[in-house]
C-alpha cells in the first residue's frame, strides 16, 4: 500500500462500519460514492457497511438499503409508471424517476396522437441501459442494444440493490449455482431486479426462496455452498414426494 505520510486509513480492510465512523484522513483520489462523506480531509461512512481497501483506494459496500444509485451504462430493469406524450416514466428503484424517450424505443419520431401504450404500458417491465445521468437531471434510458427492451415473459424478482453482488457471487459462482441447480435462466440487473424464466412453477418457487435466503444471509461465509445444498435438498424433497405418490398409486 503506497501512501504518503499525509494519508492514513484508519480501519482494517473488511471492517464493519456504521454511519459517522471515520474511515481515513488525508487526500485520496476515490470515486464519488453516496456511502462516503468527505469533510475537510476526513472521510466518514454514511451507512452500515463493509470497508474495503485496495492499495490507496477504499470504498464502503453497504449491507442495507433499498435505493439504487444510477451509473451511466448500468443495465437496469425498470417498471413503467406513466405514459406521457413523448415517452415513458420508469421506476428504477432510485431516488429519481427515469425517462425512456419513445423515439429511442421506436427508432423513429412519434406520430401526432400516437398511442404509446401499444408499445409499453403502465405495469410493464423493460430492460434498459442508463444512457445519461448526473445529479442535475433525472436518468435517461436507452433500449438500443442486444437483449434490451420489453420483458414479455417470465417473472421479475425484487431484491435490495446492495445485494446484487452477492447474488452474482465471486467469478459468478452464485449466479452459476442458481442457474445450474434450479434450471432457470436469470438476468441480474444493477438496480436490484432479477428477470427469471423457469421450466416449471416449482423451479420458480425454489429460485425465489434461494434468492431470499441470499438476501437474508449475505454476511455469512460459505453462502454459495449453503445455497447449493438448499436447492438440492428442496429438489430431493420434491423427488421423494413424487416417488411416494407413484408407489401409492
From Swiss-Prot:
GO terms for molecular function: poly(A) binding; RNA binding. One of its GO terms (cellular component) is exosome (RNase complex). InterPro entries: Exosome_RNA_bind1/RRP40/RRP4, KH_dom_type_1, KH_dom_type_1_sf, NA-bd_OB-fold, Rrp4, RRP4_N, RRP4_S1, S1_domain. It comes from the Archaea. Residues 73-144 form the S1 motif domain. It is found in: Cytoplasm. GO terms for biological process: CUT catabolic process; exonucleolytic trimming to generate mature 3'-end of 5.8S rRNA from tricistronic rRNA transcript (SSU-rRNA, 5.8S rRNA, LSU-rRNA); poly(A)-dependent snoRNA 3'-end processing; RNA catabolic process; U4 snRNA 3'-end processing. Its main location: cytoplasm. Residues 154-211 form the KH domain. Keywords: Cytoplasm, Exosome, RNA-binding. Transmembrane segments: none annotated. Contains an N-terminal domain that mediates interactions with the hexameric ring, a central S1 domain and a C-terminal KH domain. The KH domain is required for efficient RNA degradation, but is not responsible for poly(A) preference. HAMAP family: Exosome_Rrp4 (MF_00623). Belongs to the RRP4 family. Component of the archaeal exosome complex. Forms a trimer of Rrp4 and/or Csl4 subunits. The trimer associates with a hexameric ring-like arrangement composed of 3 Rrp41-Rrp42 heterodimers. Non-catalytic component of the exosome, which is a complex involved in RNA degradation. Increases the RNA binding and the efficiency of RNA degradation. Confers strong poly(A) specificity to the exosome. This is Exosome complex component Rrp4. The lineage of its organism: Archaea, Thermoproteota, Thermoprotei, Sulfolobales, Sulfolobaceae.
Amino acid at each position: 500500500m503506497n501512501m504518503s505520510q499525509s494519508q492514513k486509513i484508519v480501519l482494517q480492510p473488511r471492517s464493519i462500519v456504521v454511519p459517522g465512523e471515520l474511515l481515513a484522513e488525508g487526500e485520496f483520489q476515490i470515486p464519488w460514492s453516496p456511502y462516503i462523506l468527505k469533510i475537510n480531509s476526513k472521510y466518514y461512512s454514511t451507512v452500515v457497511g463493509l470497508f474495503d481497501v485496495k492499495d490507496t483506494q477504499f470504498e464502503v459496500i453497504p449491507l442495507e438499503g433499498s435505493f439504487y444509485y444510477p451509473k451511466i451504462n448500468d443495465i437496469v430493469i425498470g417498471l413503467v409508471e406513466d405514459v406521457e406524450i413523448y415517452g415513458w416514466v420508469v421506476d428504477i428503484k432510485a431516488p429519481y424517476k427515469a425517462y425512456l424517450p419513445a423515439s429511442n424505443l421506436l427508432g423513429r419520431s412519434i406520430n401526432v396522437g400516437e398511442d404509446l401504450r401499444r408499445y409499453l404500458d403502465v405495469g410493464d417491465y423493460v430492460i434498459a441501459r442508463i444512457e445519461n445521468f448526473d445529479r442535475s437531471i433525472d436518468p435517461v434510458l436507452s433500449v438500443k442494444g442486444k437483449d434490451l427492451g420489453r420483458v414479455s415473459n417470465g417473472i421479475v424478482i425484487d431484491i435490495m440493490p446492495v445485494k446484487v453482488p452477492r447474488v452474482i457471487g465471486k467469478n459468478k459462482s452464485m449466479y452459476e449455482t442458481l442457474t445450474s441447480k434450479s434450471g432457470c435462466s436469470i438476468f441480474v440487473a444493477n438496480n436490484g431486479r432479477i428477470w427469471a424464466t423457469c421450466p416449471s412453477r416449482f423451479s420458480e418457487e425454489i429460485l425465489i426462496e434461494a434468492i431470499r435466503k441470499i438476501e437474508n444471509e449475505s454476511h455469512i461465509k460459505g453462502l454459495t455452498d449453503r445455497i447449493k445444498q438448499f436447492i438440492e435438498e428442496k429438489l430431493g424433497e420434491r423427488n421423494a414426494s413424487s416417488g411416494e405418490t407413484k408407489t401409492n398409486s
